[in-house]
Amino acid sequence: SVNYDAKVKRTMRIKANSFRIIETDYTHNFKTEITYFILPHEPFGALVRNVTFTNLGEEADFEILDGMSRIIPYGIPGTKFTTMANLMRSYNTVSNLKNDVPLFFSRIESDDAAEMKENVGGYYYMCFDNNGTICPIYDPCALFENETALQFPINFIMHGLKFVAGYSQHFTNKISCAFAPVAKKLSTNQNYTLSTLCGFAHNEDFINRLIPHILDKEYINKKLVEADQLALKYTNDIATTTGNPILDEYFRQSYLDNFLRGGYP
């Protein structure tokens, strides 16, 4: 987030297979905790973003937008996105909106060839809380209007969440975003957790079949524990106990970094 308020404290806690950012806003009396990790032990890949908002002040109504300001769709190489951005965006599309888990992809392959080939698969973006899936805002104009730097969501700041959620969205000829819109009343010290998975899926049916499995209330917490245990399992070979715990963890991390690049011994 863009926040220049001196009364905001931000810290980062890093583990071998996950990390957490904790931001406490003493001006508006709320705390945000964001945890990232790679989903382990599943037949599909995902980057997990787990966000917990805590109200530190009196009971209040919160309007929350959490997500990504840009999603480059599947099928567009980074080099072509930078050199032919206007052409590449004309191929972009979004599907699976009816199931609240959009799939972002380029309709055709971007190769300069005589034969046009259809892309298969896309990048999914799944947001959910204890009540189920939440369809994200996918049109950046709904939030940022003409603010092309994507730093300040003008429509959200000026008109609120209801206006943004009711905006007539379009996904053709543009690079999409993905923001989950949430309105919550939180009492003192009450928190709210929003989880997001993003990754690649071969088709809509594949990711739709996984939705009930992922929506289990303990799913994210269980997977976070598994992710941390996975790193410990593969670094126990070099487990070291010295007078400095930081040095002990340095040995583990160096070992992990090396075999991820060069292979497990």
Where are these regions (language model features)?
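Short beta-strand segments enriched in hydrophobic/aromatic residues
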Residues: D25, M68, C198-F200
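Short acidic/polar mixed-charge low-complexity motifs
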Residues: H28-F30, E58, R70, Q190
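Conduit-forming functional cores of very large proteins
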Residues: L39-F44, Q169-T172, V182-K185, F200-H202, ...
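Preference for bulky hydrophobic residues occupying beta-strand positions
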Residues: I34-Y36, D66, T196-C198
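Polysaccharide-binding surfaces and accessory modules of carbohydrate-active proteins
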Residues: I21, F37-H159, D205-Q253, D257-R261
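Extended, loop-rich substrate-binding clefts of extracytoplasmic carbohydrate-active enzymes
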Residues: S1-G45, I154-A178
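Short Pro-Gly-centered flexible turn/kink motifs
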Residues: A60-F62, K184-F200
